[in-house]
From Swiss-Prot, chain B:
A biological-process GO annotation: regulation of DNA-templated transcription
Source organism of this protein record: Oryza sativa subsp. japonica (Rice)
InterPro entries, A to Z: Arg_MeTrfase (IPR025799), Arg_MeTrfase_PRMT5 (IPR007857), PRMT5 (IPR035075), PRMT5_C (IPR035248), PRMT5_TIM (IPR035247), SAM-dependent_MTases_sf (IPR029063)
Organism domain of life: Eukaryota
UniProt KW keywords: Cytoplasm, Methyltransferase, S-adenosyl-L-methionine, Transferase
PROSITE patterns recorded: SAM_MT_PRMT
Protein family according to the UniProt entry: Belongs to the class I-like SAM-binding methyltransferase superfamily. Protein arginine N-methyltransferase family.
Single annotated GO MF: histone arginine N-methyltransferase activity
SAM-dependent MTase PRMT-type domain mapped to chain residues: 321-627
Subcellular location: Cytoplasm
Record's protein name: Protein arginine N-methyltransferase 5
Binding site for a protein: 340, 449, 458
Catalytic activity: L-arginyl-[protein] + 2 S-adenosyl-L-methionine = N(omega),N(omega)'-dimethyl-L-arginyl-[protein] + 2 S-adenosyl-L-homocysteine + 2 H(+)
Region (Beta barrel) residue spans: 479-649
Amino acid sequence: MVLGLYAFADIAADGAPHLNSAAGEELVRVERAAAVALGSRAPEPPGTLFITTRRVIWVSEVEKGKAYAVDFLAVSLHAVSRDPEAYSSPCIYTQIETEDGSDEESDESDSEVNVETELSKVTEMRIIPSDPCQLDGLFEAFSHCAELNPDPNAESDEENGWAHRDEGDEDMTGGSDAECEFSDVNPIGQTDEHDITHAVVELQINDQRFEDAEEAEHETHGNGH
Amino acid sequence: MPLGQRAGDKSESRYCGVEVLDFPAGEELPAVLSHSLSSSFDFLLAPLVDPDYRPTPGSVLPVAASDLVLGPAQWSSHIVGKISEWIDLDAEDEQLRLDSEITLKQEIAWASHLSLQACVLPPPKRSSCANYARVVNHILQGLTNLQLWLRIPLEKSEPMDEDHDGAKDNSDMSDTVDSWEWWNSFRLLCEHSSQLCVALDVLSTLPSMNSLGRWFGEPVRAAILQTNAFLTNARGYPCLSKRHQKLLTGFFNHSVQVIISGRSNHNVSQGGVLSGDENHTEDTAVRHALSPYLDYIAYIYQRMDPLPEQERFEINYRDFLQSPLQPLMDNLEAQTYETFEKDTVKYTQYQRAIAKALVDRVSDDDVSTTKTVLMVVGAGRGPLVRASLQAAEETGRKLKVYAVEKNPNAVITLHSLIKLEGWESLVTIISSDMRCWEAPEKADILVSELLGSFGDNELSPECLDGAQRFLKPDGISIPSSYTSFIEPITASKLHNDIKAHKDIAHFETAYVVKLHRIARLAPTQSVFTFDHPNPSPNASNQRYTKLKFEIPQETGSCLVHGFAGYFDAVLYKDVHLGIEPNTATPNMFSWFPIFFPLRKPIYVPSKTPIEVHFWRCCGATKVWYEWAVTAPSPSPIHNSNGRSYWVGL
């Protein structure tokens, strides 16, 4: 699979992207007049959004030949955002898994070549439909297609080498059936099936923000009693 | 997103939540969730229902958001439901009580509909919470996947020792607060339901370390860290006291998830914003008010050392109950041998012990003329034979080895090994049970590894007393002695796993288990000791011990689910081998502790000793343990006559 956002060039004369029909790619939803915002950059002028069974493709209507795509396998999170405090326009918010996992965004000049290089580093993308009423439908389409693309890196149940006795009195068996049942559920807070092993809260461990405070002496005495 | 990437840690404590304090009305919930997720939080603790709602006939529940606004996957993965805090099922006011019951059931039903994994129940409002527990117990019996987390503030006031006056003692008693007691009352009333768990509210002050330790044996799922618990460092950023840091690390190591709650008390500016770039400023998302607290929590997580390799290997066995091996009655499988043979630390200790014995036995002057006769009884597939020959080579002593093994399958492997290593002239294989074999000569040294997690529970005494016939009167046995130990523990999870079998036999069985979510309540004490050679080999190996455990006063009251068992062995002189926590041999993995459960957990009030009795009983065909608590309240004698658990001779 391809990680990250990439430029898409395979566009037909009518403005629709050519799908990889041989690989079973199908069109699920089309959204006209949808803008996209990459990372913290300003939104691009409206284009057309195509959601397929494998990826999200956005084709600019203003700039001929300009289009972006991202595979669903690289979309680690999608959500509806309506809070003006979070973002000025209602939109679909997505997080994109990149190759190096870096949140670093360069401030390089806006030349064509650099823009293309930058695409693979984008980790957040917002899709802003001109009609906010379409958000729920878009979210549903996203969810449907995400389910069609389960994470191949999902943890497999490797059998541990530890000895387990199978013979002997069945009543003596330890362990619990409830254990197996519970462990099938994703932990609370984990995003869908994508366990992003390299996307974590980024910190500098020696950051001075995290220095200890001077702890009051009376507190120490109080705890000692 | 996860707080950090710690090698080997796949637990849910990597995911941090945030509490939503104001009811997200008018479909605000998706926006709040989106904002929190984009700020690196992983889930919300959010009210499900408008707190102003009171039930009236025909009214529709005013929910935060319907299942059309957020899909089931979002609800399940990113929302922990908060049940309305006004609910008070033990209120004096009858209308409030009835409204509370109706609403609690409605909210739980709604949470189940949404496929939430967990809901947080409001804390008990007074020490008496019988009606609250009754309603919750009723609900629990109908749940399948939903967990209920009872919110409990982490507090315990310390009794004043100066008051010796009787009248003041009574007054003081009523003033003493220990929130663990609230939890204990509630879960007892709810019959120790496995779906009833704890969400601890962590405040600015913490009880004593011993008191905190109790919670690690309880089903704590979340620690709700109040912003008021944070201090301010010299740079104006939030941070935690050293004691809070230590507690937090303990939570991370026990799969407890952190939820940050409260208003921001620290206004730290975002230095990185390019204020000059008007376009950039406009598009930057507003930073979450609680992000500085999350950053600090992530800092604490990322500062932790990676899990040791051995811990990573064993992590899947945490709190997993296993039946102990029966090597005397059953023939072990190749996989079992393979696993135990990888424990290089164990065989290093044996090699050291054998080397010392060889040097003591044969002086340097007699090296060239004296051959030591060594018998490995219970040779298995040969690791002790290898350790013995390596010890001989290392010390320059000459050795004649007899490898005695009763498992015919292991004997086949032994033959291959000896041919492979070219040990034909040094090693004689005896395919026989050591209890029946007649040795052609007496041995100087007898080596065995018949030890179980409790020392003698794999019937090492019976085997070695039987093998003593082979030993010269002044001969050496390795091990020369071993002792078992126990300590009382709180272990909610183990109790619930055993209870799931719904019979007495499972509560009268000892289990081998890698203990993890437990509270060790008092220091270990020794139970049984066996010496080899046995000065009185014909004496019985029956034993009886009575022990008294004093739990430190500052711990407070606790619940004892059973006893953790360990062993320590003296292989030879100062060479030890064991798993007793205070003297455990590092990096060894051949043994997990043993757990002796109690049928009914026993409540131990503060300052009250525990009295426990252990018996080791011997019959013609089996050996078994019996155990019972007699104080503070008597339990049945467990495993009477070996009816549930025994070790076959």
